[in-house]
Amino acid sequence: MQPRMLLIVALVALLASARADEGEGSLLLGSMQGYMEQASKTVQDALSSMQESDIAVVASRGWMDNRFKSLKGYWSKFTDKFTGLWESGPEDQLTTPTLEP
């Protein structure tokens, strides 16, 4: 999106310089150069912030991966401790005593 903006600004500068009179040309050219410098600085700032956000995304992904690995480790320890309770077969189940008269 930012390269489009730079292209549009350059196109506007070319159109404005083509329509400018000879007397107003230097004034218009100076103002357009100032505008172009400001626009290029804005684009550079936007690109640097995008790069910083990419670094932040990579860092947060690493943090999330570590958290999920830790969670999986806790879950496996939990399931290992209680596996005996969950895997009890039908012969291990309690039977209700029957009373005979």
From Swiss-Prot:
<dbReference type="GO" id="GO:0007186">
    <property type="term" value="P:G protein-coupled receptor signaling pathway"/>
</dbReference>
<dbReference type="GO" id="GO:0009410">
    <property type="term" value="P:response to xenobiotic stimulus"/>
</dbReference>
<dbReference type="GO" id="GO:0010897">
    <property type="term" value="P:negative regulation of triglyceride catabolic process"/>
</dbReference>
<feature type="signal peptide">
    <location>
        <begin position="1"/>
        <end position="20"/>
    </location>
</feature>
<dbReference type="GO" id="GO:0050995">
    <property type="term" value="P:negative regulation of lipid catabolic process"/>
</dbReference>
<dbReference type="GO" id="GO:0042627">
    <property type="term" value="C:chylomicron"/>
</dbReference>
<dbReference type="GO" id="GO:0005615">
    <property type="term" value="C:extracellular space"/>
</dbReference>
<dbReference type="GO" id="GO:0090324">
    <property type="term" value="P:negative regulation of oxidative phosphorylation"/>
</dbReference>
<dbReference type="GO" id="GO:0010987">
    <property type="term" value="P:negative regulation of high-density lipoprotein particle clearance"/>
</dbReference>
<dbReference type="GO" id="GO:0034382">
    <property type="term" value="P:chylomicron remnant clearance"/>
</dbReference>
<dbReference type="GO" id="GO:0032489">
    <property type="term" value="P:regulation of Cdc42 protein signal transduction"/>
</dbReference>
<dbReference type="GO" id="GO:0042953">
    <property type="term" value="P:lipoprotein transport"/>
</dbReference>
<keyword id="KW-0162">Chylomicron</keyword>
<dbReference type="GO" id="GO:0048261">
    <property type="term" value="P:negative regulation of receptor-mediated endocytosis"/>
</dbReference>
<keyword id="KW-0325">Glycoprotein</keyword>
<dbReference type="GO" id="GO:0043434">
    <property type="term" value="P:response to peptide hormone"/>
</dbReference>
<dbReference type="Pfam" id="PF05778">
    <property type="entry name" value="Apo-CIII"/>
</dbReference>
<feature type="site" description="May interact with the LDL receptor">
    <location>
        <position position="41"/>
    </location>
</feature>
<dbReference type="InterPro" id="IPR038195">
    <property type="entry name" value="Apo_CIII_sf"/>
</dbReference>
<dbReference type="GO" id="GO:0034366">
    <property type="term" value="C:spherical high-density lipoprotein particle"/>
</dbReference>
<dbReference type="GO" id="GO:0010989">
    <property type="term" value="P:negative regulation of low-density lipoprotein particle clearance"/>
</dbReference>
<comment type="function">
    <text>Component of triglyceride-rich very low density lipoproteins (VLDL) and high density lipoproteins (HDL) in plasma. Plays a multifaceted role in triglyceride homeostasis. Intracellularly, promotes hepatic very low density lipoprotein 1 (VLDL1) assembly and secretion; extracellularly, attenuates hydrolysis and clearance of triglyceride-rich lipoproteins (TRLs). Impairs the lipolysis of TRLs by inhibiting lipoprotein lipase and the hepatic uptake of TRLs by remnant receptors.</text>
</comment>
<dbReference type="GO" id="GO:0034375">
    <property type="term" value="P:high-density lipoprotein particle remodeling"/>
</dbReference>
<dbReference type="GO" id="GO:0005319">
    <property type="term" value="F:lipid transporter activity"/>
</dbReference>
<keyword id="KW-0730">Sialic acid</keyword>
<keyword id="KW-0443">Lipid metabolism</keyword>
<dbReference type="InterPro" id="IPR008403">
    <property type="entry name" value="Apo-CIII"/>
</dbReference>
<dbReference type="GO" id="GO:0019433">
    <property type="term" value="P:triglyceride catabolic process"/>
</dbReference>
<keyword id="KW-0850">VLDL</keyword>
<dbReference type="GO" id="GO:0045833">
    <property type="term" value="P:negative regulation of lipid metabolic process"/>
</dbReference>
<dbReference type="GO" id="GO:0010867">
    <property type="term" value="P:positive regulation of triglyceride biosynthetic process"/>
</dbReference>
<dbReference type="GO" id="GO:0055102">
    <property type="term" value="F:lipase inhibitor activity"/>
</dbReference>
<dbReference type="GO" id="GO:0007584">
    <property type="term" value="P:response to nutrient"/>
</dbReference>
<keyword id="KW-0964">Secreted</keyword>
<dbReference type="GO" id="GO:0010916">
    <property type="term" value="P:negative regulation of very-low-density lipoprotein particle clearance"/>
</dbReference>
<feature type="glycosylation site" description="O-linked (GalNAc...) threonine">
    <location>
        <position position="96"/>
    </location>
</feature>
<keyword id="KW-0813">Transport</keyword>
<dbReference type="GO" id="GO:0060621">
    <property type="term" value="P:negative regulation of cholesterol import"/>
</dbReference>
<dbReference type="GO" id="GO:0071333">
    <property type="term" value="P:cellular response to glucose stimulus"/>
</dbReference>
<dbReference type="GO" id="GO:0006642">
    <property type="term" value="P:triglyceride mobilization"/>
</dbReference>
<dbReference type="GO" id="GO:0033700">
    <property type="term" value="P:phospholipid efflux"/>
</dbReference>
<keyword id="KW-0442">Lipid degradation</keyword>
